[in-house]
Amino acid sequence: MKKLALLGSAGVIVVSALVACSSASDGPSLPPGPDKDAADFKRDGSGYDSATSPESGLGELLFRPNSVYSGTDGTHTFKVPVAVYDADADLTVTASDAAGITLAKTTLKNPVDPDGVTDNGKYFLITAKKAGVYTLTATSKGRSTTASVTISSYDPARYAAGKARYEAAGSGPDRPCTTCHVNGGAIDHSPAALATATDQEIGIIITTGVKPGPNVIQITSEPGTLHKWNVTDPQKDGLVTYLRSLDPRGFQ
């Protein structure tokens, strides 16, 4: 694949623009300087750009993605999607600890992407119940494959702090996140788009306007303006939690 795919080919997960308040597109890599330094954090194997997955369903049983992240605070519901490719009707998907995460089958609202490619993945929504690292195992046609699910523990107060900043303007010219992610282009930054992003990575996008690569995220309607916001640490942590709690977009 051209980029590490988040899920399949239906285009429901477009992540080059996500997290706190913008319609964005990739810009060039950062030049040397403080912003570049801020973006040079250690990668942990995750990635969160979706792209068409041409090899999906061509003979290899696999999860897409094979490593996802979510959280739980004991109060709100947190879900994250995952798909299995090249599975037959005998597909079974199990979790290493059914008390920690649960699985429910789901389907895409629009399984055919703008290029006419049909996403043939079998989708599941994972609901987080308790913090921990879990293994999903998919079995079909005598083959097995696995994926990891990392669930973080959040203080319930983080949700309220994140929701407040999401819906209200920040300091200076910083706008509410709803300006571009609910209204305007309604750019997806639900768990469908952020499944493979760690909490650290989401926080870096919010505060630096840079996504792993690193690539600069620019607001397309405002040339030269980065997707970079002034937030306090509680607001940043709250936004991470709140975004994790959104309903994954693009599913029935």
Q: Model segments located where?
A:
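Bacterial Sec-dependent N-terminal signal peptides
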Residues: 4-8, 12-70
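The canonical Cys-X-X-Cys-His
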Residues: 162, 169-184, 202, 239-243
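Low-complexity "stalk/linker" and mucin-like segments enriched in Ser/Thr/Pro/Ala/Gly
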Residues: 58-66, 95-122, 214-216
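Electrostatic cytochrome c docking/interface patches
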Residues: 148-171
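Axial heme c-ligation environment in periplasmic c-type cytochrome domains
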Residues: 184-194, 208-246, 251
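Beta-strand-rich structural segments
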Residues: 59-91, 136-138, 162-165
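Extracellular/luminal low-complexity segments enriched in Ser/Thr/Pro
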Residues: 118-131, 226-228
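A short beta-strand micro-motif common to beta-rich folds, especially ectodomain repeats
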Residues: 130-142
